[in-house]
Amino acid sequence: MKKYFLFILLLMIFFGNAQAQLKVGDKVPSFQLQDQDGQTFDINTVLGKQPLVIYFYPKDETGGCTKEACSFRDSYEEFTKRGAKVIGISGDDVASHKSFAEHHRLPFTLLADKGNKVRKLFGVPRTFLIPGRVTYVVDKQGLITYVFNNLTDGPKHVTQALEALGRIKH
């Protein structure tokens, strides 16, 4: 009986958020979260107006996440030239995001998903106990046109997102 209980417990830990991941062609779900300035950000205020790059990352001020955020920062002008809004989402709180954004001079929106409700809405998978790193490129109609899932290479999310934006018909 103990072995059975342990097996079920391990399944829950590793696959506890096993919700279907959003895919190309899906509509971005409606959500509201606080940004790094404590303001409520409603995705519906930007859907239908411009392309979006929504990237989920594990944690502020960690090696891979800092590299990824700084890569988005360094390419921010390219995103704005293409009319896209960059949005980073993690489970960190508003204060952590504010510090992270200021420390690394991040010019884009960071959203605090403390209960991981939006991460779950998107079905972003975990790798063991680590929250996943997934980037979604969204067209003006609010449809996902590209999904890139790679936990270990944060900066590659930037190049993949820029390439995907280039394929969106305006």
Pin down the residues of each PLM region.
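Short active-site neighborhood of thiol/selenol oxidoreductases, capturing the structured segment around
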Residues: 44-66, 72
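Short loop/turn microsegments at loop-to-beta-strand junctions
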Residues: 28-29, 51, 132-134
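Structural microenvironment flanking redox-active thiols in thiol-disulfide oxidoreductases
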Residues: 66-104, 115-119
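Thiol-/selenol-based redox modules, centered on thioredoxin-like
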Residues: 131-170
